[in-house]
Amino acid sequence: MYYYIFDVRQCKNRRQIEAIKDRISSLGISGEFVIPDKIRPARDLAEQGIFKGYSTIVAIGADGLIDEIAAVMLAKQQAFGVIPLNASENVHKIIAAGSWEDAVENLRYRRITESRVGIINEQNVFFSYCQIDFDKPTSITVEFEDYLLQAKARELYVANRFPGLPKKDPSKLDIIMKSVDPKSDTLWGKLKSFVSGTHIVQDLDISLVRSDGLRIFSPRQLPILLDGRVFAKTPATFGVSQKTIRLITKRSSKSK
């Protein structure tokens, strides 16, 4: 049975709320609907749904709700479904659904993909990617297991899934950086790789490194953004979950 955690604030109006419920009902995948609030946050509701014995926990909402529930779903036998509302384009791509209607269809056919998530500071998870918020080019240090990389950066992304970038290794994060001087003789320059087909490829070289863990330091604290909201601040550690989520995606999707 299905357990829907529905952030109704993401709906345009009451009519859309009813349209989503009606579509779910018409496909024969009705279940219990609950609405998160300050007293009962999404994380608690997800744990409650698992305790009640529901086989599928579904997040209906934006990136923040999805990430919060994803943290609960790690290593659980229940399937995790997503119906994105005001969510990032990347979330739509991960589940291979162009609209909430498509996402509901995904639930009907229940193609399960074992998926990992990114982890910040060993406690918070991110489903897609996060971004260091630079108000100006800033010197940063990125520490990997065997080496350090230092550069003056203007953009830096740490991604579990990044728009337009094929996921080469599900057990690693993709670290993508725009440096101020792309021709500088630094390790970033030596390791640089062009990421074709993404929205960030413009006039600068892109440095790309894949790793299962890293730490980012900066002379001053920098916000770490997830879908436009401050999620954490530097210094911060990043990793990829060893456990997986049983994510429902489109039947023809090849994402892993």
Give residue ranges: language-model regions.
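Residue-level recognition of short, well-ordered coil/turn positions
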Residues: 29, 54, 111-112, 229
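A structural detector for beta-sheet-dominated domains
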Residues: 37, 121, 143-145, 159, ...
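Catalytic core of DAGKc-family lipid kinases
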Residues: 5, 74-181, 185-189, 194, ...
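Phosphate- and divalent-cation-binding pockets in alpha/beta enzyme and binding domains
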Residues: 68-69, 90
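ATP/NTP phosphate-donor binding region
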Residues: 1-57, 67, 75, 240, ...
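Short beta-strand scaffold positions
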Residues: 59-60, 82
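Polar, low-complexity loop segments and adjacent catalytic/binding residues used for recognizing
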Residues: 63
